Design a protein with these regions (language model features):
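Membrane-interface interhelical linkers
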Residues: 1-71, 75, 81-91, 141-154, ...
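Selected transmembrane alpha-helices and immediately adjacent juxtamembrane segments
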Residues: 4, 148-180
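Residue-level recognition of pore/gate-forming positions within transmembrane alpha-helices
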Residues: 12, 39-43, 101-105, 127-130, ...
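Hydrophobic residues within membrane-embedded alpha-helical segments of Major Facilitator Superfamily
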Residues: 14, 21, 76-77, 83, ...
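Residues that define the loop-to-transmembrane-helix transition and helix capping
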Residues: 32-33, 94, 120, 176-179, ...
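Hydrophobic transmembrane alpha-helices of multi-pass small-molecule transport proteins
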Residues: 46, 110, 121-139, 269-288
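C-terminal transmembrane-helix exit sites in multi-pass transporters
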Residues: 84, 103-125, 135, 251-272
Length: 288
């Protein structure tokens, strides 16, 4: 097996397991504090990668336009993590992730609405497949739920769609490596989230985090950090046109992680929804 495929698969596996790790880590914390702690772990890992690659000097080469992009993208990333944390605290992983997974559809929708971009028949069919699959997954009754998770999941979806659209419209200058862009973006996210935690007076909730919670918080941050590192290695060594389709496997891994770590059950009928959603994602990513 080619080395880049191993990196791509490891990235997808870690990305899929992250929601289950994060839910375990922050279940007794306030959402803002949980997201801030998670982002801090990711930042430490991202900064370590930059130092390991000896690319810290590139930060001084960031132009104003690129910096503006990174600030906007980082702020949106912080909002995504905040809303995702709140959704996972109030709801199950296998209910939250199918909704947040629609961010690519949201990005295309915003692009068509604001910029009047054309939508091919193929892409429209893929979007319909993804929407239908998600509808089947979410058609189960929400036993004991209060509905808050759905509100935060949709907020995370919209913020993630805006971030995806930002990344589609403007990519960092070629002189800036992916690792440096990730580190700067995550630094912005961390600042935004700690400000939210301070303004929300949620720091005291740190006392409620158990020893296991701290361990899983660190694991969640490390999962994203290692996934980013694997992504950059896979892109460097392999065919980038195959990387995004491989990343689709993060979706079923997330649902499997919910079953393993949180005993979240899924009816047999929902499996058809997973297949439809995967087909829609795979088809859309092939056209990117």
């Amino acid at each position: 097996m080619a080395e880049w495929i191993v990196y791509a698969v490891v990235s997808a596996l870690l990305t899929g397991l992250m929601p289950s790790f994060l839910k375990t880590g922050i279940k007794k914390a306030a959402p803002a504090l949980g997201a801030a702690l998670f982002s801090s772990v990711v930042l430490l890992f991202a900064a370590g990668v930059v130092a390991m690659e000896a690319r810290a000097g590139e930060i001084l080469e960031i132009g104003n336009e690129t910096l503006l992009y990174l600030v906007l993208s980082g702020a949106l990333q912080g909002v995504v993590w905040l809303c995702l944390s709140a959704a996972l605290i109030h709801g199950n992983v296998n209910r939250v992730i199918p909704i947040t997974n629609l961010h690519v559809c949201g990005a295309f929708g915003i692009s068509v609405w604001l910029f009047h971009t054309t939508l091919s028949v193929w892409k429209l069919c893929c979007i319909l497949l993804l929407l239908l699959g998600t509808l089947l997954l979410e058609s189960r009754p929400d036993k004991g739920g209060n509905g808050k998770w759905a509100l935060f999941a949709f907020l995370a979806l919209f913020a993630s769609a805006a971030k995806t659209l930002t990344d589609m419209l403007y990519l960092p200058e070629s002189v800036i490596s992916v690792s440096v862009a990730n580190a700067v973006r995550t630094a912005i996210s961390t600042v935004v989230l700690w400000c939210a935690a301070l303004l929300g007076k949620s720091l005291n909730s740190a006392k409620r985090i158990t020893a296991d919670g701290w361990i899983f918080l660190v694991l969640a941050g490390m999962a994203i950090g290692v996934a980013w590192l694997c992504d950059s290695r896979a892109a460097l060594l392999g065919d980038s046109s195959y990387l995004l389709p491989i990343s689709c496997t993060a979706f079923p891994v997330a649902l499997l992680g919910a079953r393993i770590f949180h005993k979240e059950e899924m009816p047999a009928g929902a499996m058809f929804g997973i297949l439809l959603a995967l087909a829609g994602m795979f088809g859309m990513l092939l056209e990117l």
